[in-house]
Amino acid sequence: VYRLFVQSLTSSSRLGLAMKSHVAWLKRAGIAGLLSIVVSGCSDNNSSFSISDRTRSLIPEAQTGVSEAPGVVKLLDEKFGDPQTLKAWSKLPVQWGGASAKVEVFAADGADAKVKFVAGEGQTFPEKATFVNVVTGAGAGRTLQLSSWDAATGEAVLTGLGGATLAAGDTCSIDGGAVIQSGRVLYMRHCSHCHGTAGDGNGPTAQYLYPRPRDYRHGVFKFTSTNDMSKVSREDLLRVLRYGIPGTYMPSFLLMKDEELTAIVEYVRFLSMRGEFERKLVNELASDYSEEAVESRLKDEQRADIVGELAKFLAEDVPGVVDGIGAELEESWVAADSDEAKIVPSVPRVPDSEESRRRGRELYLSKTLNCADCHGIDGAGNGPQTVAFEKNPITNVPYDEPGLHDVWDNLNQPRNLHTGIFRGGRRPIDLFCRIHAGIKGSRMPSFKNTPHEDIWHIVNYVLSIPFEPEPGATGVASAPAAPATEAAAPAAGE
């Protein structure tokens, strides 16, 4: 474990080019896989991460731990820290910022010293840097201030050594954690009042908003350009930040700098991974060690025996569970940014035409796709599913109100297609992705097995609905079915 003490951090002044993650370097160097980033000078944003209701449903010993074996709350703190003391778990595919380096030359001069650093493999020095964290050697754990820094040569002047010395070969981190900490400050300033400090979608203004702000802790984001089995990509999150979500209270941050948006994206991903970690860990414990489960077990067992069994499980099995969850998070979030995850139509967009729209409406009404079941025959968002009572998939108990619910248990009205407002974007490719992958976390399913040409026909029809002289005017009742369309070149401007 090594610590990065980030002093007087402002919203973006230390980002520079510090976007090279040193996770891989940490693993090659054999350094413990946890990096603690301690922020001071941010008292205006002091806060703490909340734990989920599902964590609270566990018995106290499962939450806090037994003896030396940590429970859910302590493991969350060990791996993720709190907003003032973020911890960078090396398994997480997050761009923390900063660069790893080794000391090549160290020449002390009183309380100061001239140092030359050599960047680690695959690392790029940040253009601006104000501190160095000593990772190995006699000064390990110290944070030293830079009075001058040259990113081109790696030469620096350290000030206020206080007796600390470095030697050739010592490992240091230059401005480590600058990106994630900048993201944290920006998030607290611009996002937390709706999305909450922990990303739980329960900030102080959330109760007044419809739809509710996104709860990141599921690791699920609705509007993506990735396939139905993949998570949200960085580019998807950047697009939401830049352009907002039409028809909701999510605004556009188009005037923010690219490096600021990038920092927020990394912090949102960090919060999502923290929430997923908590959920997956609780899933391992809930069946035997929730308050409800223990109450049932007490009919035949003693509480002391149950707690003893829990202590053994936490000490012997949970470390492996934690590593497994970390590996799963790493794999799934890395995959989301891969070419394989991105939705790419196999044919160009079918030119928008009356025939294409008719074919699209045929498909919309077909038993195979059955779009009208939710969106209504005329696309007004009033299909029969809006008055049916669903069961909660977790509790298997019907919801109190009719209609469609998402994974956050929010009531979702299917989109009224006559408004022309599409929350995931109104570009043809945006609608293609909504149909291909569905809307993650909602009842809108994936139609990935539908021929891409047919998806384009549906896109053309849906985009025409707001301009129909009357609902269903492009319907097929008075018109012959449109013939199958050959793969066509993109329409002008597409």
Task: Go through the PLM ranges and name each one.
Residues 38-41:
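C-terminal motif of bacterial Sec signal peptides marking the signal peptidase cleavage site
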Residues 61-102, 107, 111, 120, ...:
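Electrostatic cytochrome c docking/interface patches
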Residues 283-296:
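Charged, amphipathic alpha-helical linkers/stalks
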Residues 177, 255-262, 285, 451-455, ...:
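Extracellular/surface-associated beta-sandwich interaction domains
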Residues 43-50, 178, 184-211, 244-247, ...:
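Periplasmic/extracellular electron-transfer cofactor-ligation site
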Residues 49-97, 207-256, 261-269, 294-316, ...:
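Extracytoplasmic electron-transfer domains, predominantly the class I c-type cytochrome c fold
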Residues 5-15, 19-30:
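Bacterial N-terminal signal peptides that target proteins for export
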Residues 97-170:
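Autoprocessing Asn-cyclization modules and mimics
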